[in-house]
């Protein structure tokens, strides 16, 4: 999206400025604010996406449903909704935090660094998926338990943030509970 920025953070995770999103993601990416969201359908299936080959970091890699950066003055819920519409063309509901304190740093094979305070959410998809080809090259609906097993068995096949999010016991439980509520 044109004109997007990242909110830079100091080591106490407090806002310390802003930087244009594309310029922020480099070989020495500063700590900044982001979010990650795992989307589910009414049957409790997880939407996994394959990042477009045009992405600067981890192109072509399978990952959780959607990630992004809140803009100044925007709540996380507003940011999640905005990116779901932009990347996947979907409307969502029931946004819930599953790992609010997630923070990670990872280096892509091309040297680009992710360095984020990145609260993790779950949400329910309430419309058909219409992916933006600039963001997503493929997608699949999968069973959460199957995906968690795949992440544990073959972590190299997925984005590092998805693997790290799934390694957190409380986040796994929150995702499992979210799916149970959807299935009623």
Curated annotation (Swiss-Prot):
SUPFAM superfamilies: Nudix (SSF55811). This is Isopentenyl-diphosphate Delta-isomerase. Binds 1 Mg(2+) ion per subunit. The magnesium ion binds only when substrate is bound. Its EC number is 5.3.3.2. InterPro entries: Idi_bact, IsopentenylPP_isomerase_typ1, NUDIX_hydrolase-like_dom_sf, NUDIX_hydrolase_dom. Homodimer. It is found in: Cytoplasm. It comes from Klebsiella pneumoniae subsp. pneumoniae (strain ATCC 700721 / MGH 78578). It is an enzyme of class 5 (isomerase). GO terms for cellular component: cytoplasm. Mn(2+) binds at residues 25, 32, 69, 114, 116. Pathway: Isoprenoid biosynthesis; dimethylallyl diphosphate biosynthesis; dimethylallyl diphosphate from isopentenyl diphosphate: step 1/1. It catalyses: isopentenyl diphosphate = dimethylallyl diphosphate. The active site is at residues 67, 116. Catalyzes the 1,3-allylic rearrangement of the homoallylic substrate isopentenyl (IPP) to its highly electrophilic allylic isomer, dimethylallyl diphosphate (DMAPP). Keywords: Cytoplasm, Isomerase, Isoprene biosynthesis, Magnesium, Manganese, Metal-binding. Its cofactor is Mg(2+); Mn(2+). One of its GO terms (molecular function) is metal ion binding. CDD domains: NUDIX_IPP_Isomerase.
